[in-house]
Regions:
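An N-terminally biased module of ancient metal coordination in phosphate/nucleic-acid-related enzymes
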Residues: 1-68
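Active-site neighborhood of phospho(di)ester-bond hydrolases with catalytic His/Asp-centered motifs
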Residues: 2-4, 37-40, 72-76, 130-132, ...
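Non-catalytic positions within long, well-ordered alpha-helices that form the structural scaffold/packing
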Residues: 30, 123, 180-181
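Active-site environment of divalent metal-dependent phosphoester hydrolases
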Residues: 44-47, 78-80, 136-140, 164-167, ...
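Short acidic, glycine/proline-enriched helix-loop-strand junctions
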Residues: 48-56, 65-70, 197-223
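Extended substrate/RNA-proximal surfaces in nucleic-acid metabolism proteins
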Residues: 50-158, 236, 241-262
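C-terminal helical cap
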Residues: 167-169, 215-243
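Short acidic/histidine-rich active-site segments
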Residues: 184-200
Length: 262
């Protein structure tokens, strides 16, 4: 499995608090069947994004893993004016594995009406947004049609493995399961921060997804799409949005198409 969102690198944000904890998180991932991890520290006003320090911490951790886990870097990108402007000349500074996909996190308290345009700007600058853990965001849960519009303009969706297991509350779980059933999700990731409450594990969530919607979809969400993002390739699994979701007012609904696997 491939995890595209975790906070495994120590001393950079609210994730691992030491190199020893980071190594134990990596060992937890290996035991869980994870082969590739993208370390994605926060990039916000509280935690400045420091690419050189991030690479140094990645290399230090990688040297302890005996080739059992491949580590890459990216970031958990907060949509501030400063971040968007800094991304403009060099989007790969922030993208996953310095390719094309960008994890984008929304504020839980306010999502301005201009967000459609901001996401479009990111795309014009060369980044493909992946909306992180929207099932945990009360504003998106209350008005998911906004997210569907972003999907229609080329954004993708990542939910947290622990949400599917009910560990972020019933509302997040119900939303994640609904989107899973409707083909709204493109990735499941750990968003791991530590060894206990936010572990670097995916296996249990994968088994639940396989039980609910089948092994092929589980493989797409935990392996095929994440590996494509890791490599900077087009995603092989992109279901068509259900009719009417995210349509502009007055638009003619699109016919529902079946999704496919390559």
């Amino acid at each position: 499995m491939v995890d595209i969102h975790c906070h495994i690198l120590f001393g950079l944000d609210d994730g691992a608090d030491s190199l020893e904890t980071a190594q134990k998180m990596a060992e937890m991932a290996i035991a869980d069947g994870i082969t590739h991890v993208i370390a994605t520290p926060h990039a916000n006003s509280t935690y400045p994004f420091l690419p050189e320090a991030i690479r140094e911490r990645r290399d230090e951790l990688q040297s302890r893993l005996n080739g059992q886990l491949v580590l890459a870097t990216g970031c958990d990108f907060h949509l501030s004016y400063e971040n968007v402007e800094d991304l403009r000349p060099n989007p790969t500074k922030y993208t996953l594995n310095q390719k094309k996909y960008l994890l984008v996190e929304f504020n839980d308290f306010s999502i301005p009406p201009s967000m459609d345009q901001t996401l479009h700007l990111l795309q014009l600058y060369g980044a493909t947004p992946i909306i992180t853990h929207p099932e945990r965001n009360p504003l998106i849960r209350a008005n998911p049609d906004r997210m569907y519009r972003w999907m229609r303009q080329g954004c993708y969706v990542q939910v947290t493995a622990q949400s599917l297991l009910g560990r972020f509350g019933s509302q997040a779980q119900v939303m994640a399961e609904t989107w899973l059933r409707d083909g709204i999700i493109h990735f499941v990731a750990s968003d791991a921060h530590n060894l206990s409450s936010r572990p670097l594990q995916l296996k249990d969530a994968r088994e639940k997804v396989a039980d609910k919607v089948g092994k092929n979809v589980a493989q797409a969400l935990f392996e095929d799409n994440p590996r494509a993002a890791f490599d900077g390739r087009p995603l092989p699994y992109v279901p068509e949005l259900p009719d009417d979701l995210g349509q502009a007012p007055g638009a003619t609904p699109k016919r529902r198409k079946r999704f496919w696997f390559f």
